[in-house]
Amino acid sequence: MDMYQKRKIRAEKKNNDSQKSLPSTSINWFPGHMAKTRRQIVEDLKMIDVVVEILDARIPNSSQNPDIRQITQNKKKVIILNKYDLSDKAKIEKWIEYFIQKGQKVVLADSLTGRGINETIRQIQKIMEDDMQKMADKGRIGRKIRVMIVGIPNVGKSSFINRISKKTSAEVGNKPGVTKQKQWIRINEKIELLDTPGVLWTKFENENVAMNLAITGTIKDDILELTEVAYTLIKFMLENYSSNLLQRYSLNEELVNEILSQDQAENENIYEIMQLIGKKRGAILGGRVDDERTSKLILDDFRSGKLGNITLEMPE
């Protein structure tokens, strides 16, 4: 089979799979338990002093549920940029400026190592200092600061709670939505925390948001076509972190540039580089590169930090 025939087959396959892959505006899913959780959050907010919202530092905008942002807008808030260890430190500085300009407190965190935990506690107590003093003046001594922690699935919320509470009570897993039941957790003598399950929005209106969530593994790998997700990541890295990609997969820079300069559709050039990575990693099935296996190993490398420190988006 020559290259022309292979391209024709891939084009036909891409056309057949288009309903599953892009555009992301066609993705309309909302598990029933998430609708129930949203209603519960609205009810619980009545007794909450401070909202701690956990975002993924690699995708601060895409990992912020606009629905949750709207229903918590009148509450004091601390923004946690979690998974900071996996993010691009230079780009994160721009995000810090962005949130500060919006009048929000920001903490850089890594829930796996405990980075940012003490700073989060300090910010919660600082933001409530005046209110607690007013309560004390009125004789309400010993009243704890009530904090709600929110975030979409798979941003490291359970690990963060375990760190801040010095316990392992919250069930932790790699799959979205693993923590489902409401629970109050004592942080110290001044703070008690209400955990909530992760909530995604009903429909992804923005194609980039949907793809960023897929790349980081926030939504399940069967929501979007895996090869499309890996393709998008490779394209982004070639434009922004090419040296990371070349180094990880021992790719020859001249060969990659030659492929990219070929007089053919851009998607064909990127696909050839995916094939090259598959060959390098031995992702072969029946004598040919296994696209799905190649896509999975590329995404796994990104999610585990093996492709380096990367942030996928910048403030607008």
Language model feature labels by segment:
Residues 75-85:
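Active-site cofactor/substrate anionic-group-binding motifs, chiefly glycine-
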Residues 119, 123, 159, 232, ...:
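Alpha-helical scaffold segments in soluble metabolic enzymes
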Residues 55-58, 84, 99, 164, ...:
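Anionic group-transfer/hydrolysis microenvironments
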Residues 111, 161, 191-194:
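Conserved active-site beta-strand-loop modules that form the wall/rim of enzyme catalytic pockets
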Residues 53, 79-81, 149:
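Structural beta-sheet core signal
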Residues 1-50, 58-59, 64, 71-77, ...:
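Helix-rich effector regions associated with P-loop NTPase G domains
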